[in-house]
């Protein structure tokens, strides 16, 4: 095995040296780096940024980038304010779809720090006033006069239909806890594997609608793009906040981003699509913001930041009227609502607490957006106000935090694009990133270094600092012949040591078998005498012989040795 690794490593060295010599000889021949790395294998943002995002959007990628650059500072300050940085959820709610509890994340990065010092919170976050704050029309009182006044002055909404796209009862659960989102940032936790794949597989399977009408294509496409955009946005966040094990810092990881998002233009496009959806919801609810009861808790600075963000949005970013516009589409809208509600419930199956937290925040934010877009489609202002009155403070908090997450994703996508283009402009950097991405040469180098570790300690290495295009991660032995000989000798020593261990184990096993056979006659004879003695005493009339006399001592064996 060592020889195989050695040969593979030597082949890798030859390839690297050949590539380096080709790049360094600029006067003799120039290499077009795109011939080594075909552009078809790297699909980062291969789209026309001047085109519209989709059939339901009248906005381009470039326009969203400009809007995001303008609102990003105020939006970041807004979600870090006292009102918008807290969220309430049940971290221990059981999964309603399956009972697989084998995927718990025991990593510290998966944990969530909940709020315990309530005295440090503002007044509107104290326990006695937490919960839904609704309009007076929804308050239930025992005062008959108040009830009659309400009937006379306010419209009645009989047979009220379900307009919820998420389970709002979770906010009032006795098991729910308050969490500071700024103290629990969304970042890479190491959670994944089969359990994570099961979560996303179940979410994507919700895109199976019962109706077969051709008009549902736009709705199905919108549903899929929402889920895909959510998935891609989360992947972007985790790639942007990835732990560098060498420096111990959280920093962008271009390779991880390209693997999850960058090599798939449709995923990048769906992030922008989700940005447009949530932006349209914020634009649509703007006229009613001051009429929300809990909005009185804002200070003037927060109100100014909200207006500063929402005022830069417009209605053309998303046209929800194209999705549901007739009776058949009304049934499709109910199916759409139920299925997205299931998506929010699937987040209760996530076994990583921090992943569940941000999954709940973002799915609740999307659910709130859909409720605003699809349920406020009536021209009646009173009916619109009724929908607004059904909003809770946690839905509004989730809405703005989800918009912040999408804004962060758009910002990160542009940063990753700059990093990607920077590597393309430098041939040495591009070659180095290629080998680091595959990690093949790094594995070979680690195997080779572990085999000749003792020989490398004896060698003195000069010229420690080299250029990046000289492949610093490949440690070239200076004396190949001597190093190969020493490696061969050490490999022989390792083989001899392994042989000695196996031979010792074989002798011990053989000794055990032989001893068992040699002791068999003695063991059988003792057992026979014991049985005959018991039968004889029973024959001569000694009752309960073994119980009345001393107990016989059986030979003891230590099975743990």
UniProtKB/Swiss-Prot annotation:
Query: Which cofactors does it use?
Result: FAD
Q: Which residues form the signal peptide?
A: 1-18
The catalytic site is made up of: 352 (nucleophile), 355
Q: What is its EC number?
A: 1.8.4.-
Disulphide linkage map:
95-349, 105-110, 145-166, 152-295, 352-355
Entry keyword set: Disulfide bond, Electron transport, Endoplasmic reticulum, FAD, Flavoprotein, Glycoprotein, Membrane, Oxidoreductase, Redox-active center, Signal, Transport
Q: Which locations, inside or outside the cell, does it occupy?
A: Endoplasmic reticulum membrane
Q: Where does FAD bind?
A: 187, 189, 200, 228, 231, 260
- Attached carbohydrates are found at 20, 39, 135, 342, 452
One Gene Ontology cellular component annotation held by this UniProt entry? endoplasmic reticulum membrane
Q: What class of enzyme is it?
A: oxidoreductase
One family name in Pfam for this protein:
ERO1
For whether the record's keyword set contains Transmembrane helix, the answer is no
Q: What does this protein do?
A: Essential oxidoreductase that oxidizes proteins in the endoplasmic reticulum to produce disulfide bonds. Acts by oxidizing directly PDI1 isomerase through a direct disulfide exchange. Does not act as a direct oxidant of folding substrate, but relies on PDI1 to transfer oxidizing equivalent. Does not oxidize all pdi related proteins, suggesting that it can discriminate between PDI1 and related proteins. Its reoxidation probably involves electron transfer to molecular oxygen via FAD. Acts independently of glutathione.
Name the family.
Belongs to the EROs family.
- This chain's protein is named Endoplasmic reticulum oxidoreductin-1
Q: Which organism is it from?
A: Kluyveromyces lactis (strain ATCC 8585 / CBS 2359 / DSM 70799 / NBRC 1267 / NRRL Y-1140 / WM37)
Lineage of producing organism: Eukaryota, Fungi, Dikarya, Ascomycota, Saccharomycotina
